[in-house]
Amino acid sequence: MERKRYSKRYCKYTEAKISFIDYKDLDMLKHTLSERYKIMPRRLTGNSKKWQERVEVAIKRARHMALIPYIVDRKRVVDSPFKQH
Protein backbone atom coordinates (compact mmCIF):
# COMPACT_ATOMS: atom_id res chain seq x y z
CA MET A 1 0.00 0.00 0.00
CA GLU A 2 1.49 3.30 -1.06
CA ARG A 3 1.47 6.38 1.08
CA LYS A 4 -0.57 9.30 -0.13
CA ARG A 5 1.67 12.15 -1.22
CA TYR A 6 0.60 15.70 -0.65
CA SER A 7 1.60 18.49 -2.96
CA LYS A 8 3.79 21.27 -1.60
CA ARG A 9 1.65 24.01 -0.12
CA TYR A 10 2.78 27.45 0.88
CA CYS A 11 1.71 29.51 3.85
CA LYS A 12 -0.83 32.03 2.59
CA TYR A 13 -0.27 34.28 5.60
CA THR A 14 3.47 34.58 4.92
CA GLU A 15 2.91 35.23 1.21
CA ALA A 16 0.28 37.91 1.92
CA LYS A 17 2.57 39.47 4.58
CA ILE A 18 -0.19 39.55 7.17
CA SER A 19 0.97 40.79 10.55
CA PHE A 20 -2.07 39.92 12.70
CA ILE A 21 -4.92 37.41 12.57
CA ASP A 22 -8.14 38.77 13.99
CA TYR A 23 -10.57 36.28 15.52
CA LYS A 24 -13.49 38.35 14.15
CA ASP A 25 -12.35 37.93 10.54
CA LEU A 26 -14.15 34.68 9.73
CA ASP A 27 -13.34 34.86 6.02
CA MET A 28 -9.66 34.48 6.84
CA LEU A 29 -10.23 31.68 9.34
CA LYS A 30 -12.57 29.59 7.20
CA HIS A 31 -9.70 28.27 5.07
CA THR A 32 -8.27 26.52 8.12
CA LEU A 33 -11.56 24.94 9.22
CA SER A 34 -13.12 21.78 7.83
CA GLU A 35 -16.80 21.58 6.93
CA ARG A 36 -17.46 20.28 10.45
CA TYR A 37 -15.55 23.27 11.92
CA LYS A 38 -12.53 21.29 13.01
CA ILE A 39 -9.08 22.86 12.75
CA MET A 40 -7.24 21.30 9.83
CA PRO A 41 -3.61 20.22 10.28
CA ARG A 42 -0.62 22.03 8.79
CA ARG A 43 0.04 19.38 6.17
CA LEU A 44 -3.34 20.13 4.58
CA THR A 45 -3.41 23.92 4.94
CA GLY A 46 0.27 24.57 4.22
CA ASN A 47 0.60 27.02 7.10
CA SER A 48 3.95 27.47 8.78
CA LYS A 49 4.21 26.51 12.45
CA LYS A 50 4.09 30.14 13.59
CA TRP A 51 0.94 30.96 11.64
CA GLN A 52 -0.76 27.66 12.45
CA GLU A 53 -0.41 28.41 16.16
CA ARG A 54 -1.76 31.94 15.69
CA VAL A 55 -4.70 30.66 13.64
CA GLU A 56 -5.50 28.07 16.31
CA VAL A 57 -5.56 30.76 19.00
CA ALA A 58 -7.81 32.96 16.84
CA ILE A 59 -10.21 30.08 16.15
CA LYS A 60 -10.37 29.19 19.84
CA ARG A 61 -11.14 32.82 20.69
CA ALA A 62 -13.85 32.93 18.02
CA ARG A 63 -15.37 29.76 19.45
CA HIS A 64 -15.31 31.24 22.94
CA MET A 65 -17.09 34.37 21.64
CA ALA A 66 -19.68 32.12 19.89
CA LEU A 67 -18.72 33.23 16.38
CA ILE A 68 -17.88 29.64 15.38
CA PRO A 69 -19.62 26.57 16.84
CA TYR A 70 -17.63 24.10 18.94
CA ILE A 71 -19.40 21.05 17.56
CA VAL A 72 -21.73 20.52 14.64
CA ASP A 73 -24.36 17.86 14.10
CA ARG A 74 -24.31 16.06 10.78
CA LYS A 75 -27.69 17.57 9.97
CA ARG A 76 -26.36 21.10 10.40
CA VAL A 77 -23.32 20.69 8.15
CA VAL A 78 -25.48 21.76 5.21
CA ASP A 79 -26.13 25.20 6.73
CA SER A 80 -22.74 26.89 6.63
CA PRO A 81 -22.33 30.40 8.08
CA PHE A 82 -19.58 30.98 5.51
CA LYS A 83 -21.93 31.18 2.53
CA GLN A 84 -21.13 33.90 0.04
CA HIS A 85 -23.74 36.67 -0.03
Curated annotation (Swiss-Prot):
Query: What GO molecular function annotations does the UniProt record carry, in alphabetical order?
Result: small ribosomal subunit rRNA binding; structural constituent of ribosome
**Pfam families membership:** Ribosomal_S18
What SUPFAM superfamilies does the annotation carry?
Answer: Ribosomal protein S18
Description of how the protein assembles with itself and partners:
Part of the 30S ribosomal subunit. Forms a tight heterodimer with protein bS6.
Task: Say if the entry is tagged with keyword Nucleotide-binding.
Answer: no
Q: Which UniProt keywords apply?
A: Ribonucleoprotein, Ribosomal protein, RNA-binding, rRNA-binding
> Which InterPro entries does this chain map to?
Ribosomal_bS18, Ribosomal_bS18_CS, Ribosomal_bS18_sf
Family to which this protein belongs:
Belongs to the bacterial ribosomal protein bS18 family.
Entry's NCBIfam families? S18
Superkingdom of source: Bacteria
State the protein's purpose.
Binds as a heterodimer with protein bS6 to the central domain of the 16S rRNA, where it helps stabilize the platform of the 30S subunit.
Q: What is this protein called?
A: Small ribosomal subunit protein bS18
Matches recorded under PANTHER family: 30S RIBOSOMAL PROTEIN S18 (PTHR13479), SMALL RIBOSOMAL SUBUNIT PROTEIN BS18M (PTHR13479:SF40)
Q: Does Cytoplasm appear among the keywords?
A: no
Question: Cellular component per GO?
Answer: cytosolic small ribosomal subunit
One of the GO BP terms on file: translation
